[in-house]
Amino acid sequence: MKHIRNFSIIAHIDHGKSTLSDRLIQECGGLTDREMAAQVLDSMDIERERGITIKAQSVTLDYLANDGETYQLNFIDTPGHVDFSYEVSRSLAACEGALLVVDAGQGVEAQTLANCYTALEMDMDVVPVLNKIDLPQADPDRVAEEIEDIVGIEATDAVRCSAKTGVGIKDVLEVIVAQIPPPEGDPEGPLQALIIDSWFDSYLGVVSLVRIKNGVLKKGDKFKVMSTGQNYNADRVGIFTPKQTDTTELKTGEVGFVIAGIKEIHGAPVGDTLTHSKHGAEKALAGFKKVKPQVYAGLFPISTDDYENFRDALNKLSLNDASLFFEPETSSALGFGFRIGFLGLLHMEIIQERLEREYNLELITTAPTVVYEIVQTNGETIYVDNPSDLPAINNIAEMREPIVETNILVPKEYLGNVITLCIEKRGVQTNLVYHGNQVALTYELPMAEVVMDFFDRLKSTSRGYASLEYNFIRFEPADMVRLDILINGDRVDALAMIIHKGLIRSKGLALVNKMKELIPRQMFDIAVQAAVGSQIIARSSIKAMRKDVTAKCYGGDVSRKKKLLNKQKEGKKRMKQVGNVEVPQEAFLAVLKLND
């Protein structure tokens, strides 16, 4: 056991986590040069296209150290993006240490801090590594100082390497062996294995990634899942080298997979504990804290026949992604679908893309909303994540919106732009600290503003240099109202949104004008209105297409023309009463992109 090292790689987006993992795999001969592909561990197509890591992946490597001993390194490549921070905390729970990778050119960024604090809170040893030293703008000494200054861990002797060229990779491996402690646990004790991750394979059923804390799990053992009490047979156990490799047993301290032919999707939930059916452990391991979704949106299949497939797809995805929450929803405009909870907008995009790609579904999304706390006049408190569930205005005593604490790191030349943006988003500044060239800003912002387009705007005002991470702190009373869009006097539930009172006029007008462009003209006039309660605040009409009914009369009596025109008038009137207006898919998405 003293030859096992379990560690995670944590870093900000684009500081070279996945490339460093590739080099470590290559150095230890996990894959031959022929099988080596860039970003081996980013196995999803979306991950490769966007160049980001979404799912944490694990690898087991054997490394012959300078002291002549062979060490087993189990490491987990983690995502850097703020929406996936729960993936990071899950990966860290399986490790004793973490490599903190910092780009020697960019220096410390917000996610570096956030992930590092997560690791330190879990009492882990954090080993700093300066990556990308081959770049002309690299300045390792300054960055080492920044790490000590901002993060507060010793970094003068930090390993310097370049994952791209392979310089210093050997040193990284030596540091891992020297500075990360071996796992603790009792190999003789009853089995306790923590499920770190699981996914659904259509041939094998549920595949679970586990970390053995105590005891041994052998192939063929009977084990039970502690939360459900169900018993299963371990058909296959093994490790990823990154290829799936079967072994005969998983020993204390190891990380590997278990396949037990579990067919029901929630048979082995993430964060659960496995133990032997006979003489098992008494109590379960501390799991992970459940992450609460921050943003909700409605997703509807374009053809109603896909509803069942959509439900299956969501079930399978939620196994792999513990933070996904969903419940059925119906909309008069869009039919049957689901209300889904996400961690942020990137998470929402990724899930939608995975549903469309991996399960061949065509989906419509409604505008995302956050969860509001509402105190009704009868004293009852309710939580609303869907604008159409909002009670009538006269039943609401107080409405509270979620506030997040946002930590932003930005080079000082862009400080002004970022502060202007935060003020525009109704932010309150709580802290500002200078660290050399970087400024650490802390703002309290309404979550609704952060999830809409704050991230993109922040990147564009700071030329991509600012970085951010946020967490929910409390609900705060706010003047929020529901803005409805009426088309020919009918409310379209999928277009409703909850916004701040101060923005009603501008948002209402913008939305109405956008709808005017997007809804195709009909044979009759269409009125598009924005309303709050019963008060109309903006209106625009889509003019009817004109059909020239008098074209066939030339000369002749004027009463003949009048008769035809009146007949047309009657027809239009009738049409207007029964006519349905098709609202195209783009109109629903327009709500999201109003500020462009």
Swiss-Prot record:
Subcellular location: Cell inner membrane
InterPro entries xref list: EF-4 (IPR006297), EFG_III/V (IPR035647), EFG_V-like (IPR000640), EFTu-like_2 (IPR004161), G_TR_CS (IPR031157), LepA_C_sf (IPR038363), LepA_CTD (IPR013842), LepA_IV (IPR035654)
Residues in tr-type G domain copies: 2-184
Keywords, ordered alphabetically: Cell inner membrane, Cell membrane, GTP-binding, Hydrolase, Membrane, Nucleotide-binding, Protein biosynthesis
Residues of the signal peptide: none
Reaction equation(s) it catalyzes: GTP + H2O = GDP + phosphate + H(+)
Keyword Protease attached: no
EC number(s) recorded for this UniProt protein: 3.6.5.n1
Family: Belongs to the TRAFAC class translation factor GTPase superfamily. Classic translation factor GTPase family. LepA subfamily.
Name of the molecule in the record: Elongation factor 4
Gene responsible for this protein: lepA
